[in-house]
């Protein structure tokens, strides 16, 4: 099981299923949970990658001031995603429905892709980190045919992972954790 951690933990199917267990999961108004670390808001965090090995590139952007989470404005990021909502529960797999909805809202992806679940992300060093639990997904694109749909994803595009690693301090904590994990896989 996942247990108590901070940072990045490799994916474990049993822990993931426990998180999604209806006996443990509930929908609450964001106003009730945004400042309460006893509740963890589940966030699919999708990383778009093209290429392989040292030549691979990740989609990255700067969060604009109109994006939902004010505490992350002006931060650089490699993750696309957002909150699972009650509306996502209408589908057969609420987590996947939420992830696909967030991707469709924020990105235009016009190429084939494959998916790998990398792991869990939790950052207890900041107020925003203490109330969210991320599930990092690596989306391997066949070609770099992806662009931001949402106008609040600014200065976006694909960059070599080595460049992102060199400038990792400009990125939000979750992105730093994922860049470190992916850089170690070269």
Write out the residue ranges for each language-model feature:
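Nudix hydrolase/Nudix homology domain
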Residues: 30, 73-87, 119-124, 129-186
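Short N-terminal binding/cap micro-motifs at the start of the first secondary-structure element
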Residues: 1-5
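Acidic, metal-coordinating catalytic segment for phosphate/diphosphate chemistry
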Residues: 6-54, 63-67
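Conserved Nudix-box catalytic region and its N-terminal flanking loop in Nudix hydrolases
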Residues: 56-105
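A short, structured loop/turn motif at beta-sheet edges
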Residues: 52, 108-111
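Residue-level detector of short, conserved catalytic/binding motifs and their immediate flanks
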Residues: 42-45, 95, 135
């Amino acid at each position: 099981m996942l247990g108590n951690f901070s940072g990045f933990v490799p994916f474990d199917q049993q822990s993931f299923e426990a998180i999604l267990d209806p006996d443990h999961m509930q929908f609450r108004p964001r106003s009730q949970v945004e400042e309460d670390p006893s509740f963890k808001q589940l966030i699919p965090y999708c990383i778009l990658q093209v290429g392989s090995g040292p030549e691979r590139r990740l989609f990255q952007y700067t969060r604009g001031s109109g994006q939902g989470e004010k505490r992350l404005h002006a931060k650089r990021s490699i993750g696309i995603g957002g909150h699972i909502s009650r509306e996502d529960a209408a589908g057969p797999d609420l987590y996947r429905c939420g992830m696909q909805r967030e991707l469709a809202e924020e990105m235009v992806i016009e190429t084939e892709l494959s998916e790998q679940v990398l792991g869990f992300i939790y950052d207890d060093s900041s107020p925003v980190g203490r109330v969210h639990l991320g599930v990092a997904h690596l989306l391997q694109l066949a070609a770099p045919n992806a662009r931001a749909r949402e106008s609040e994803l600014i200065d976006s595009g694909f960059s070599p992972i080595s460049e992102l690693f060199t400038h990792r301090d400009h990125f939000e904590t979750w992105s730093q954790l994922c860049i470190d994990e992916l850089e170690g896989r070269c």
